[in-house]
Amino acid sequence: MMNHFLIREKFLNFFKKNNHTIVSSSSLIPNDSSVLLTTAGMQQFKPYYLGDLDPIADFGSKNTASIQKCFRTSDIDEVGDETHLTFFEMLGNFSFGGYFKKEAISLAYEFLTKELNLNIEYVTVFDPKKVDANDWRKNVPEDKESFEIWKSLGISEDKIKKEGVDNFWGPTGSEGPCGPTTEIYIKNKNNQNVEIWNIVFNEYFCDTGQNLTKLKTAGVDTGMGLERLLMICQNAPTIFETDLFDSILKILPQNLPLKVKRIIADHLKGSVFLISDGVRPSNKEAGYVLRKILRRVIVYEHLYNFNQDVFVNIIDQIIQIYGKIYSNLNSDKNIIFDEIFKEKEKFEKTLKIGIKELEKIKEINSSDAFYLYETFGLPYEIIKELGKEKAENLNYLDFQKELEKHKVVSRQGQEKKFGGHGLVLDTGELKAGSKEEIQKVIRLHTATHLLQQALREVLGEKVRQAGSDINAKRMRFDFAFDR
């Protein structure tokens, strides 16, 4: 069985042999201030796609490959099922005018079928006939070239599926590079088809009016999740039965629900990497993400009353698994422990008060649940578990409605107090020091709403705001999108 070390080695050696410069993973905290965390392998190469930097000068090649640390906040609430993670690693090869479709597809095919001996179940390519008539991508030509390349490699026509907008990637904002994609699917142990590799051909620039023009230099951007690939190569039923998770899950008490085990393993792993890359628990930006996942784990520890040594052993095991790949985890070990246990000590005081409040309530309704959540950080599932009979009539839909109602009330209160824009001087989201700056911030605040609406029109209703930071000079808008 191939372990994760061997797969990493095979991937990097394969692309090095095929004239790619191997580039180390960048930090989870990107240099790009427009995003909160690193979510894909291409992020550190964005300036090269845009022509702002020269890959020859920096890498000695127009082709690179990397294994990138990634963290996606959009999946936090889904962690615990068979497929979702917050922290993961992405294998990728990239080209900034060095090669295009034929080479990109051929390299992917060779690596999967020859190096890893895997069988491709089917692939997908872009076809505008599958796109709605009024969609801005309707006039993009069918990707016949990719279709023919796959055929030439021995993939039969019935296994080359033509898809619509799901096979067109980008732009990542209101404008930028974009293009058709081809995706590779392989069957897992459960006989399910798993998308294993996505190859994006950035050949267009899309402006804010959704007009497409050909890029001067076309680029290739590919991504393949290491955890998914391990699941396939190790014939595991889920991503959690691979050697990146097995030894961690075995440390946890056996009486814990499987979902809880997975959440704890994922969230502590994410915490270790975020702290090592400089994030500290706080109420803002990446620090808030770290605080949220850490506190969720702390609540489960309290709920199931397992020994604190379990925490220590899991963190040790995570560092042991990844320390040979990311040596800074070893040197940062004391910092990682200090930050996690400082946050643990701080939150446990609030948690105890919250549980006492819960015990005072005779019958917990959605309003009570929201109060416990908002004031003491008790998640819905913990309220249900601790409340037992007192919470038997509480359901998640009512709890969600209470959350939405609170958002509406908050917005109305802000509008009444601050002239309809919800602005205060330095709230942590919107920052202004004078009336003149307030007017500038108001305009940028309005722009975030317009941007979000535009994103939804282009990418779909799944776009969700994940945060923003606005001052008189600039704005940052973070959003989550399930692709």
Positions of PLM-derived features:
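A glycine- and charged-residue-rich anion-binding loop/surface
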Residues: 1-483
